[in-house]
């Protein structure tokens, strides 16, 4: 964004732009300290906003009204009196900052403020961004996660943004609007920029969102009228071969900037002879909502959740204080940000995680359809035999990512039923196992499939390290569409030890597919076989005894109207009652769950919620950070105009529930 106003050397400010003699310097200073924190701060973390910097800015500006827009709160913890609990300001409101104020903000940021437009706006001739060549390129790449992660405002799954601006092949209308895409984004490369953004949003009562890569299933990085903090380029990495953590861990560790993505983390770990716990999707950001929400991984059955690996975090809180959080320093923040979800009390700038052994790893991929079996009964018997092996597979430290459905599965269409069932094992991943060991583990199930006359051809891949096995087995995922609504449930070990509950689960799988739904599931445990999980995280307790994470989804056409989306959305939410009844004391993984999950605080957070909510009130009492399913979300509502029977959608004004 270009600087549009300046101040005179004499110090007289003119927001109207009449005096154009010199621009404001970036509001930041590089911190040096006699005491070096452990681990040492990254360069981007040493560039900070301080009271001294703001005092110098105020002295030059000689305009207290403008200077106070960027000030720290009066106390070390934000008070509700600083910003009244009221609806967030929107563009067009009289309280919305003037363009010249945004220009001041951009100057203080050092030029990193971006006025955003929807990614697909180049496809619409009535938009100033119209560019047919650019549109063609965007349309071609629209389903690629790399396209959306590289844009400051776009998200991977646009349904909960409001379907505001999609390329014509995917748009149900012929229009493009800003919708719930943020109106401004700060492309942060320093802590100071995050602090400025937080101060400005808090003091001006702006809606604030945080985007790392935009992977969240429920669109946490979107918000109508919002200012976004974009952490994508916080990419620093450091290997710590003999790190001593406050919790007693002594061993190799890696410090990652919060913008480092899974593929970058895996590559770096491999280069130094290690592995790390991260997501299966290539482009997920390691230090964003993934780890904050717990973070399941292809290595979870071996080592536990991503949150379990974190030894230290650096965080900018809602009062813009930059802190270190560990098991002994700001321990309540450390607890909350490892499992309590993203968009709650602050912005993580880096995290230090355990560096794990570089394990040999085998992966297996295979498929079978009903046409590869004697018939539907044999197909579903084969699926049931997989369920029977969940416990054995998880106890061996393996992970399986599978799909079950029918090729015509779509609510409201003619359904071909049992003529097109399919089972697809995207990847059966066996860490610390050779091909022969993996074959031996799979033999009992495969022998049973052979006895059923099920045809399948397993493809084995082996590498002497996790990264090389993972990279060929987990392709970039299908994103960018608004045609899917999902719900999920974690099913515990007790379900599969009980014949009646196991049979109910097997019948539920078949019923889901016969109802036109699809299943995307994982055999997985949140308690790794190699280590005991830490006791000081806020990870949903249901993860610790889970044997499978089951996602069930409905789908519709790109051109479907809101009425079809409403019916399909409510249908899958209601259908999930089947699994909720089978495992009533379990829960759901918040990052891959139903936005309108009943009793979502219990489902996503379990017994941790009361403490999480109390910490939310302690560290963010004004509700600066908000997301639809985040801690404290029940105090707010998004007043949408979309024709849905619920207000949980990011495309609307954010207001307290009482307003």
What role is predicted for each listed range?
Residues 1-26:
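Fungal secretory targeting signals
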Residues 19-659:
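Soluble FAD-dependent oxygen oxidases
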